Amino acid sequence: MKVKLLLTAITLSCLAIDVLAQVSISGKIVSADTNEPIVGANIRIDQSLSGCTTNDKGEFSISNLPDGKHVLRITHVSYTPKSITTKGGEKNLLIKLQDSFTNIGQVVVTGTGTHHRMTDSPVPVSVITAKDLSNASVTSLDEALQKLTPSFSSMTNGMGTTLSLNGLPDDYFIFLENGKRLYGDGTYARINVAKIKRIEILNGASSALYGTNAIGGVINIITDDAKNAINVSSDTRYASKGRFTQSVNADVNTGKFGSYTSYRRQQAEGWQLNPYEENSKTHELEETGKVASTGFYANTVNQKFTFDATDKLSFYARGGYYDNKTRRPYEAYDYNILHETFNYGIGTQYMISKGNYITADYYADHFSSSYCFFKDNKTYNGKAGEEQVRKRTRNHNLSIKGIFKLGGRHKLSVGTEYIVDVLKSQTDNIAKEEAYTLALFAQDEIKLLRNLQALIGVRYIYHENFKNHATPNVALMYKPGKFNFRASYAAGFRTPTLSELYATDIAKKNDRLTIGNLDLKSEKNNYFSLSAEYVHERFSVSVNAFYNNIRDMIDYNTIATGDKAMEQYGHKEVRQRDNIAEAKVHGINVSANAYLGAGFNLSGGYTHLNTQDVELGQPIDKSIKNAYNINAQWAHSWKIYRLNINLNGRFNSKRFSKSYGYAPEYQLWNLNTRHSFNLKSVIIEPGCGMENLFDYMDDRPYNSNYATLTPGRSFYISLSLKFKS
């Protein structure tokens, strides 16, 4: 009994000491040139998980810190990073940051899993900032990627939109949100652009760190979970064809507890580019009510709670819901399509000591796709008013990761991951199919010399159906002065999805049946890259050359046509997924950014690709050869008013499609303006602009391989409100 009382007394004493030792640091961050407050600056505490962002007055406050000295690291996309040492309990700090015109201090985590300035990362990572998104007035992630990076292109048809990165479709690259992989269909459609802090883009294979599907690249969306007391904002945008987006964000932080809530509503009318379509039998044009761009409405709700038990131990819980339902014209269709997703996750992070910490995360994603019939339908035996679930997928991911500094030259990342995929389909008569994957990975960042560093990693995989596999990667970076030279090699792999193994699909226009294949093998690749970069205070330029060789690529193999297909399968053509292709992609990415003075910025990028399906001697499906983008911006402030004018241009060469032939080349130009009024309690930011300045429209008959679905020249208005705490 005495022992228990003694232990209890000691525990309570330690807790009391810990509480008494807690201190706070607060202050204000301003521009060194103008003394104006800097909004959205990030402050991190060394040897701690604590941090925050400045509010609309440039103020910050970090509590629950142990007494003693602390190193504050301050970063902002428009300013040079700064570090200062403070004593515990300091109040009213005034920190001044110098302007940075070329994003020189941007911090990234993609590619290594650890924090680096972008110019210090051993693997080349490009970044799209929240400022870039706002200047371009984008409303969706796929729009942002295409407008602001020439490496991305897209193709939209009756089955939806497919993004491509450096010639490879979206089956070959993955999306992360704050470093956590997103699963399910249409992942990028669920992202609320209003919450994005930055987008980090890693070109090339990275399966060693991120697992299957990371053959072509990784896109990591970093969201803005500001740690101020209260943050409330609203973003509204309306354009022609009923294109409406409304986002509302409400964040509350009480020190230890945080709540982050966001809602987004999107909707649009459908439109035709041509009122005619080609009859598949007579090849004559006939009138149609079918639309090239389908009307829809979509809702996204996300909630996240955080709890910082100490400055070294934190927890979170998150959940989200997304739905997207088409609005097809009654006279031309029998049903609408409804996609629904809900996801949830929990996690914790514990900092053992400076540079050493452990994270544990669990994430689940539940996706369903349904036919909502408003007429009777023979193909799917649907009745008007019925809803038929065509597919359900479940993804569960449990991961544990540790990062450890070993001496002054090594930073080791090790971890394990367990994934379960589940597929159900009423239309395909799939009661339930599932598979699990177990992975172990390790990666070491090595500082060889002062200007020379290396990265070496490997991932071991055991898949329930495809057994053992290992993927290594290695990267080298030499940094003399303002130059960065990088070389890398990575092996990647992609296991066939459950849909590719089991699911079927019917193309009604040409009566074609696609069936699965249980004998599929994993796709594998080797990726090589060389890059050079020069970074100056007022301009930067980078060049990246790469080669990607993919083996056992899954494609379609026609197994029956005509009478044989009708007799055996009841369709005119039957094809099966098979490992029949080898693909090669080599290309070059060039990007440049310059501050011209007097508020003028100019940036641009160019991508050249040579893609080849080796078996067929033709380009890879949905790939393009050349693309470039240009962004010109001017900004100026007059006391409480700031004007921002942005001109954006995008050029695409012809895009290849195995089914439809080439889509024509095109270019689109957009003019955007933002007008910011920094008032006492709110920042009011109206905007207006013109999309597709030169009124380009691909008006070929319905079901053509359209270059783009733009309805022609259109105007938009927007309004952003940010309430000050």
Residue ranges and their predicted role:
Residues L6-T8, A21, D251, D308, ...:
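Conserved C-terminal beta-signal and adjacent last beta-strands/turns
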Residues V30-T34, A41-D46, R73-Y79, K87-S134, ...:
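Short, acidic, small-residue-rich periplasmic hinge/interaction motif at the N-terminus
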Residues S61-N64, S153, K180-A205:
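Short acidic/polar hinge/loop motifs at secondary-structure boundaries
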Residues E90-K96, L141-A144, L148, T161-S164, ...:
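N-terminal periplasmic accessory domains that precede
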Residues K227-A229, R237, V252-I337:
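Periplasmic-side early beta-strands and strand-to-turn transitions of outer-membrane beta-barrels
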Residues T294, V389-K391, N395-K401, E433, ...:
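Outer membrane beta-barrel strand-and-loop segments of large Gram-negative receptors
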Residues K325, S368-S370, N429-I430, E464-H469, ...:
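Surface-exposed extracellular loop regions of Gram-negative outer-membrane beta-barrel proteins
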Residues G408, K447-Q453, Y547-N549, Y569-R655:
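Gram-negative outer-membrane beta-barrel transporters
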